[in-house]
């Protein structure tokens, strides 16, 4: 699967529920997206796979820039790709990187804020490493006090 394409793993009419992927399947799509990462500076390659309520999958990888602040994390790439294609309702995201044992990768603070704003508090984030270790948390568990619409 290309990190630039979306995948629709299941088909269904508006009246029949869409069967979502297992956590392991979503992580595997994130792992495949990781292969496309552009990380010449940190060599820290990250992949993400985002599932919409309709069952569509959007993947992303991190893309680094020599001006580090212009780099983009895999989680935001996947979310922005989905938003740009008209999706607005998300259920889960998987993110994977090569992290030490017993430490699945965790989204950075900027990604947690964007995830919170675009996915909502009850969506699930599945964090994984290449050793097969998984950890899942709700968005509100990752960012319990977000800067959100209530400030406006």
Segments the model singles out, each with a brief description of its role:
Residues 30, 48-49, 78, 82:
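Small-residue (primarily alanine) positions within well-ordered alpha-helices
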């Amino acid at each position: 699967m290309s990190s630039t394409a979306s995948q629709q793993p299941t088909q269904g009419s508006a009246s029949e529920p869409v069967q979502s992927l297992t956590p392991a399947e979503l992580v595997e799509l994130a792992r495949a997206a990781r292969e496309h990462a552009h990380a010449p500076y940190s060599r820290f390659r990250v992949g993400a796979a985002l599932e919409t309520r309709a069952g569509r999958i959007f993947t992303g990888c991190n893309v680094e820039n020599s001006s580090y602040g212009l780099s983009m994390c895999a989680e935001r790439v996947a979310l922005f790709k989905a938003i740009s294609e008209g999706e607005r309702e998300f259920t889960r995201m998987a993110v994977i990187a090569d992290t030490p044992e017993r430490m699945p990768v965790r989204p950075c603070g900027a990604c947690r804020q964007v995830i919170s704003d675009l996915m909502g508090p009850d969506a699930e984030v599945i964090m994984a490493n290449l050793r097969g270790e998984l950890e899942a948390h709700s968005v509100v568990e990752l960012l319990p006090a977000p800067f959100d619409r209530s400030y406006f």
